[in-house]
């Protein structure tokens, strides 16, 4: 049977970058990995195919040879450096699967740990600031109870006679010697003659796990909480992976967060801005007062020390910044409109410049601009 194009195997364009190749290989390998598809011959073949494709395309010399000659580049010694499967893949697997399966390709698969699991936890701002204990439910692989994770119905596990329990075999390709996973035991180092009827020899079963998570006060979007040993159960009774809970804080109707500081807008009336007043504002700890001085303009910031968020790391407290917005009155009555018209009539001549200096400066600027344009 003819081999598929390596770029097609990984699902990338021929001009794909090294990073795109690596991501594509990660997706392909994770999808077809034998640990996730126990007993599935088609998945195992697909896994080996994407492994071979990545080995060639991730090597600059081999990729150039493949682009020029296709699969023929690795027949009869062409291409140099051995054909696909030549070099030890330990470094690649250590990089890509190191954090997922607990190590590189060296040694029996039994030395690997379970996969880490990710979970996104959404919180309201108040919950993130105060801290909370939350119960979550996650689908994951847990140790098979009937066989205690061994994968064997009777608990008996035999040492592989091909690799003698090492999970690796040494092969020679021309002048190159390499280690690869034992094809007889699939790198486990052991064989199961009587597979467990519950897990079919995998040693693990899918189940929804319920956990209680204590979220510390002050967390923010992007913070991660690690729960050691709460990830997927390891294959063949090996240690489990970890659970990483990523926090996402929902947008708040009043406050915007910037680190440990909070920001909000405080609308005030024209009369309050002109004459001054004391207004009450909301904080996460209750109400507080702000004294608005006379002649306050839109955009003025008022700082309330210690009314922000207590830092999850240093335990110091942030501040609350209140930005004043002078609100234009709407739905005026006839009397209110008349009073405002009378008030506006007082802004004439130099009085207008004195009471509205920014407006006067703006008008002068516009007049000067047109004078220069028409002169």
UniProtKB/Swiss-Prot annotation:
One GO term of the biological process aspect: response to heat
Which residue spans adopt a coiled-coil conformation according to this UniProt entry? none
Query: Which GO molecular function annotations are given, in alphabetical order?
Result: ATP binding; heat shock protein binding; unfolded protein binding; zinc ion binding
For activity, the cofactor(s) needed are: Zn(2+)
* Compartments, record wording: Cytoplasm
Q: Which Pfam families match?
A: DnaJ, DnaJ_C, DnaJ_CXXCXGXG
Key words, A-Z = Chaperone, Cytoplasm, DNA replication, Metal-binding, Repeat, Stress response, Zinc, Zinc-finger
Q: Does the keyword Repeat apply?
A: yes
Q: Where are the zinc fingers (CR-type)?
A: 131-208
> What's a single GO CC term here?
cytoplasm
- Positions annotated to bind Zn(2+) 1: 144, 147, 196, 199
Q: What does the record note about the cofactor?
A: Binds 2 Zn(2+) ions per monomer.
Residues binding Zn(2+) 2 are: 160, 163, 182, 185
Q: Map the CXXCXGXG motif repeats onto residue numbers.
A: 144-151, 160-167, 182-189, 196-203
Q: Where is the J domain?
A: 5-70
The reply on keyword Zinc is: yes
What family does this belong to? Belongs to the DnaJ family.
**What domain comment accompanies this record?**
The J domain is necessary and sufficient to stimulate DnaK ATPase activity. Zinc center 1 plays an important role in the autonomous, DnaK-independent chaperone activity of DnaJ. Zinc center 2 is essential for interaction with DnaK and for DnaJ activity.
On subunit structure and binding partners, the annotation says:
Homodimer.
Q: What does this protein do?
A: Participates actively in the response to hyperosmotic and heat shock by preventing the aggregation of stress-denatured proteins and by disaggregating proteins, also in an autonomous, DnaK-independent fashion. Unfolded proteins bind initially to DnaJ; upon interaction with the DnaJ-bound protein, DnaK hydrolyzes its bound ATP, resulting in the formation of a stable complex. GrpE releases ADP from DnaK; ATP binding to DnaK triggers the release of the substrate protein, thus completing the reaction cycle.
- Spell out the protein name for this chain: Chaperone protein DnaJ
| Protein species of origin | Xanthomonas axonopodis pv. citri (strain 306)
Ranked from the top, the taxonomy reads:
Bacteria, Pseudomonadati, Pseudomonadota, Gammaproteobacteria, Lysobacterales
Instruction: Report the gene name.
Output: dnaJ
């Amino acid at each position: 049977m003819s081999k598929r194009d390596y770029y097609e195997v990984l699902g990338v364009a021929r001009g794909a970058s090294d990073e795109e190749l690596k991501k594509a290989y990660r997706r392909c390998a994770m999808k077809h990995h034998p640990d996730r598809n126990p007993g599935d011959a088609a998945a195992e073949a697909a896994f080996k195919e994407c492994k071979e494709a990545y080995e060639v395309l991730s090597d600059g010399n081999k990729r150039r040879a493949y682009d020029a000659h296709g699969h023929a580049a690795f027949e009869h010694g062409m291409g140099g450096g051995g054909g696909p499967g030549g070099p030890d893949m330990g470094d690649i697997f250590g990089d890509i699967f190191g954090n997922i399966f607990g190590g590189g390709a060296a040694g029996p698969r039994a030395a690997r740990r379970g996969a880490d699991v990710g979970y996104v936890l959404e919180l309201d701002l108040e919950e993130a600031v105060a801290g909370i204990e939350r119960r979550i439910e996650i689908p994951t692989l847990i140790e098979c109870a009937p066989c205690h994770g061994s994968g064997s119905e009777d608990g008996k596990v035999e040492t592989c006679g091909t690799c003698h329990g090492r999970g690796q075999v040494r092969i020679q390709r021309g002048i190159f010697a390499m280690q690869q996973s034992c094809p007889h035991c699939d790198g486990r180092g052991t064989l199961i003659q009587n597979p467990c009827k519950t897990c079919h020899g995998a040693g693990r079963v899918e189940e929804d796990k319920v956990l209680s998570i204590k979220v510390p006060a002050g967390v923010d979007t992007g913070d991660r909480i690690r729960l050691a040993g709460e990830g997927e159960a390891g294959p063949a009774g090996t240690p489990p992976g970890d659970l990483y809970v990523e926090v996402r804080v929902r947008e708040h109707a009043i406050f915007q967060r910037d680190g440990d500081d909070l920001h909000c807008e405080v609308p005030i009336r024209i009369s309050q801005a002109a004459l001054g007043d004391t207004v009450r504002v909301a904080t996460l700890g209750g109400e507080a007062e702000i004294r608005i001085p006379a002649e306050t303009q839109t955009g003025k910031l008022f700082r309330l020390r210690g009314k922000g968020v207590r830092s999850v790391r240093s335990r110091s407290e942030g501040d609350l910044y209140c930005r004043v917005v002078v609100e234009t009155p709407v739905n005026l009555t006839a009397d209110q409109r008349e009073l405002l018209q009378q008030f506006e009539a007082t802004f004439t001549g130099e009085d207008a410049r004195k009471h509205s200096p920014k407006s006067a400066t703006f008008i002068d600027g516009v007049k000067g601009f047109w004078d220069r344009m028409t002169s």
